[in-house]
């Protein structure tokens, strides 16, 4: 029976602290981390995930890479017998309330921005977001003769060359490629440092000169050189009904509105496609999984316009699947989706935000599975209670345990955010160990589960028109069971109600939480976990 049940095993990883390598690019917490890793091994965890910060490694100058601290960290992980998921973190860490760590993108890159501030994402008020370079400069050779895509490719190449021993040994099994703020493939549409607060719809962030020029050229190409960006979209903290664009039957449905939304979201897909193609070339032949992170924009999901998703770059409507198009692009690169919100329940959300995290998770996971992708998830808030763990378990195997082999649909892996003493002590640790056992289908930890084949070359380039064929018709998601069939202990009354956006911005669990909800210690949807940073 065990041989058949083994196909239900879902790997569990734990995200390391944001400052596992210090802001001075030194490995200073070896003793503390070593003790915590022992606890993870005891719990049966398969591996860990870590941000590999661009701002630290290439901080001293163009191509002046310093990997020494990360090598020490990776050696510690290897000695613990754990696998490693490495995030190519091309974004800034820090800049918001609650962020204990501040790691900007390299100073020499920011210096280019003093001469040309349009290298940064820009909102309609002219405010620059310095957490991540605008996709408008992907192919612009503005950075000491290199384009943004070339800088990212060179960084990944140097990583491969310097971490070859860990790649060859099978320690590094996953390369998650940062594609935007908080490491997510999205626009910085809801920056707290610009005054955004939950559940604001956010704003379209495409006002740098490079994206403006691209839009004008695209509009002229379809015979409408007079078209401008929409001016009826409201501001960061509006609700959909307060805007002409997002309200029911609003101008987002007009010819001009549809053209703009397609242009905005298509550029994001092309951005991901370009950088993943480079990542594929860099890691070609190595036994690694390429992955990207998609943000869980769950607020306003229940309104027709899906306003907050649209401003983030996810063109998702009741009759248009904005996530399957992304999955179709990823299929070319055999890359996986890493999604968040896996622990969230609709009933924990504020009714005014029209949130539906459970339906969103169901849609995104189904989109990935329909395209034949490996699909992974994370939690949004640090939670330690059976209620949250059981929601994750339900999403990990939405049809339950299959006694005769691998289930038709299951997560490829789950990453818990994040490692702390609170996780590995007392009842929290007891619950976590039980959760890991349940994710493993009550089987012993297996370091050889889901072996990776050498990464093949990406498939032939496909046109955006072919990618968009995945958007319609929008199919119903696969059915999910209401509850897991392999639960962690009692579930009653242990959740609490989420007051803020808990996928991408933190938020606080409202009401009695019994030590299980609390405030997000840091990023809740970002690859590294930090809140979206803007200045």
Curated annotation (Swiss-Prot):
Sequence repeats: from-to residues: 489-499, 500-510, 511-521, 522-532
Protein's GO biological process: polysaccharide catabolic process
MF terms (GO), sorted A to Z: beta-amylase activity; identical protein binding
Domain of life: Eukaryota
UniProt KW keywords: Carbohydrate metabolism, Glycosidase, Hydrolase, Polysaccharide degradation, Repeat
Keyword Protein biosynthesis: no
This enzyme's EC code(s): 3.2.1.2
Region listing for 4 X 11 AA tandem repeats, in residue ranges: 489-532
Active-site residues, record numbering mapped to chain: 184, 378
Catalyzed chemical reaction(s): Hydrolysis of (1->4)-alpha-D-glucosidic linkages in polysaccharides so as to remove successive maltose units from the non-reducing ends of the chains
Family under the similarity heading: Belongs to the glycosyl hydrolase 14 family.
Assembly and interaction partners: Monomer.
Protein name: Beta-amylase
Biological classification of the source: Eukaryota, Viridiplantae, Streptophyta, Embryophyta, Tracheophyta
Gene that encodes the chain: BMY1
């Amino acid at each position: 029976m065990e041989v058949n049940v083994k196909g239900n095993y879902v790997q569990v990883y734990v995200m390391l602290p944001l400052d596992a390598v210090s802001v001075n690019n030194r490995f200073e917490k070896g003793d503390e981390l070593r003790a915590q890793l022992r606890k993870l091994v005891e719990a049966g965890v398969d591996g860990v995930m870590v941000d590999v910060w661009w701002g630290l490694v290439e901080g001293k100058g163009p191509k002046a890479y310093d990997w020494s601290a990360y090598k020490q960290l990776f050696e510690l992980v290897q000695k613990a017998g754990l696998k490693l998921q490495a995030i190519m973190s091309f974004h800034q860490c820090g800049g918001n309330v609650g962020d204990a760590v501040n790691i900007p993108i390299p100073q020499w890159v920011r210096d280019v921005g003093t001469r040309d501030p349009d290298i940064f994402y820009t909102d309609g008020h002219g405010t620059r977001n310095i957490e991540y370079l605008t996709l408008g400069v992907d192919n612009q050779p503005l950075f000491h003769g290199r384009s943004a895509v070339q800088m990212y490719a060179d960084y990944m190449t140097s990583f491969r060359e310097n971490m070859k021993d860990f790649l060859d040994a099978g320690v590094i099994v996953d390369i998650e490629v940062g594609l935007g703020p908080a490491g997510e493939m999205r626009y910085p549409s809801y920056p707290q440092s610009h005054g955004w607060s939950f559940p604001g719809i956010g704003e379209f962030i495409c006002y740098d000169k490079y994206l403006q020029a691209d839009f004008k050229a695209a509009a002229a190409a379809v015979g409408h050189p007079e078209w401008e960006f929409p001016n009826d979209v409201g501001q960061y903290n509006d609700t959909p009904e307060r805007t002409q664009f997002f309200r029911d039957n609003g101008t987002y449905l007009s010819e001009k509105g549809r053209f703009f939304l397609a242009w905005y979201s298509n550029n994001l897909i092309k951005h991901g496609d370009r950088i993943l193609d480079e990542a594929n070339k860099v890691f070609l032949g190595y036994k690694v999984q390429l992955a990207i992170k998609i943000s869980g924009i769950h607020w306003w999901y229940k309104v027709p316009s899906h306003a907050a998703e649209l401003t983030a770059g996810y063109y998702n409507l009741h009759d248009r699947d904005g996530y399957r198009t992304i999955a179709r692009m990823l299929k070319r690169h055999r890359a996986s989706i890493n999604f968040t919100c896996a622990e969230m329940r609709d009933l924990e959300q504020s009714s005014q935000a029209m949130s539906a995290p459970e339906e969103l998770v169901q849609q995104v996971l189904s989109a990935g599975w329909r395209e034949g992708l490996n699909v992974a998830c994370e939690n949004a808030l640090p939670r330690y209670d059976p209620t949250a763990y059981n929601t994750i378990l339900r999403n990990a195997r939405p049809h339950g345990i299959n006694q005769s082999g691998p289930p038709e649909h299951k997560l490829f892996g789950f990453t818990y955010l994040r490692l702390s003493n609170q996780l590995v002590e007392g009842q929290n640790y007891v619950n976590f160990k039980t959760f890991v056992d349940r994710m493993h289908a009550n089987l012993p930890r297996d370091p050889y589960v889901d072996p990776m084949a050498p990464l093949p070359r990406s498939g032939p380039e496909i046109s955006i028109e072919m990618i968009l064929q995945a958007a319609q018709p929008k199919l119903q998601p696969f059915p999910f069971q209401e509850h897991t069939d392999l639960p962690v202990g009692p579930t009653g009354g242990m959740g609490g109600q989420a007051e803020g956006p808990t996928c991408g911005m933190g938020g606080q669990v409202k009401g009695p939480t019994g030590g299980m909800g609390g405030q997000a210690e840091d990023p809740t949807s970002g690859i590294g976990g930090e809140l979206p940073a803007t200045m």
